[in-house]
Amino acid sequence: MKLPSGLGSIHFVGIGGIGMSGIAEVLHNLGYEVQGSDVADSANVKRLRDLGIKVMIGHSAVNVDDADVVVVSSAIKRDNPELVAARTKRLPVVRRAEMLAELMRLKSCVSIAGTHGKTTTTSMVAALLDAGNFDPTVINGGIINAYGTNARLGDGNWMVVEADESDGTFLKLPTEVAIVTNVDPEHLDHFKTFDKVQDAFKTFVENVPFYGFAVMCIDHPVVQALVGRIEDRRVITYGENPQADVRLVDVDLKGGITRFGVVFRNRAGETVHEISGLKLPMPGKHNALNATAAIAVAHELKVPDDKIIEAIANFGGVKRRFTRTGEWNGVTVFDDYGHHPVEIAAVLKAARAASEGQVIAVVQPHRYSRLASLFDEFCTCFNDADHVVVAPVYAAGETPIEGADRDHLVQGLIAHGHRSVTALEGPERLAQVVGGLAKPGDYVICLGAGSISGWAYALPGELAALKPAA
């Protein structure tokens, strides 16, 4: 697996980002000279430095003095001093998706797209192909617990990639197997309308070559409608839907382990294959659906059933996806990246099925624009939580929007019938608030894409300091 040699030093602007860090790591492991910069230290920056990659903190024109190629993500503004310097020097400037596409060009690729579930599904596909001795290269949008990283370089002919639709660049990725988990209104700052979001996913599937196939979840009505619009490409449908080609059956959500089976049917509706006794060591029907997508791909690529069953049973999950951070007095605390109403509802439903006590949701809304555009959905996605604690919005660089803040969300939840909603002043008050609500057997789920992950890891210790266990 090689790009042209002699590229010189490849500089990543924002190398600590989850998408950029994975590409940088794979290029480094291929033997290329890689360096980069980021605004702050982070776990990803530390990991890259431990690999021997030079990372500068802060953006400055001098950082690209020794660069021969500059890679940028869509988050990098045109006036970034490193981008300005690169263009002044007439250096090649490559978008993140273009560099990813260049890596993908050298392998057969499975690309996982969808508004939710991409990262977990990508990890599951990687685990199943690994179990089938495919030794895939993987670039994911989250840290895979089994690898301790979001990227790995494999010796096999296949590559598994999370396809980020947020800026439309997923349409540049050369894909032989496309997975679409769901399609919801999101990233409207780029697409402007939901119709354009759906059109982009249609193009994503139609870009698959004639010898490839798409795996699409028809439990989701928008995806089912999309299936009906796609011509001249092979589509394998999956879901609990009785019409699915690969059907999720016999789901049992008790005890934090998801037990299920998968039935494969031909176009005449006849069962041609069945895998039963699957056990996924994480809660939630949404995770069983993600696993079904991965199983559909693995089965199509001839991974044996016993390897599929073993890989699902040993699946280690993804960091920040229902990740247990600790326990205090019988209260278990979890960290989850969920920041869209559909994701939040799915996580809380899983928690409700797994918990023997109450479910306490602590949410840090991510971006004013998302809260504003999906306000009604946010007001109704916490039904499976006995208590909701709402923190101030994590701005992510945005300016406030009237009516889209913590207090309006608290009012909205109460107006929509929620019985227990508390406004949180800040993380320093979290232990006191949760300590007043939680009892042994309860689950506390910290939700959001911002700084709340740190709160989730600190909370068990803060609770212990505040209220020693009985």
UniProtKB/Swiss-Prot annotation:
GO terms for biological process: cell division; cell wall organization; peptidoglycan biosynthetic process; regulation of cell shape. InterPro entries: Mur-like_cat_sf, Mur_ligase_C, Mur_ligase_C_dom_sf, Mur_ligase_cen, Mur_ligase_N, MurCDEF_pg_biosynth, UDP-N-AcMur_Ala_ligase_MurC. GO terms for cellular component: cytoplasm. Its main location: cytoplasm. ATP binds at G114, T115, H116, G117, K118, T119, T120. Signal peptide: none annotated. GO terms for molecular function: ATP binding; UDP-N-acetylmuramate-L-alanine ligase activity. It is an enzyme of class 6 (ligase). Pathway: Cell wall biogenesis; peptidoglycan biosynthesis. It is found in: Cytoplasm. Cell wall formation. Belongs to the MurCDEF family. This is UDP-N-acetylmuramate--L-alanine ligase. It comes from Xanthobacter autotrophicus (strain ATCC BAA-1158 / Py2). The lineage of its organism: Bacteria, Pseudomonadati, Pseudomonadota, Alphaproteobacteria, Hyphomicrobiales.
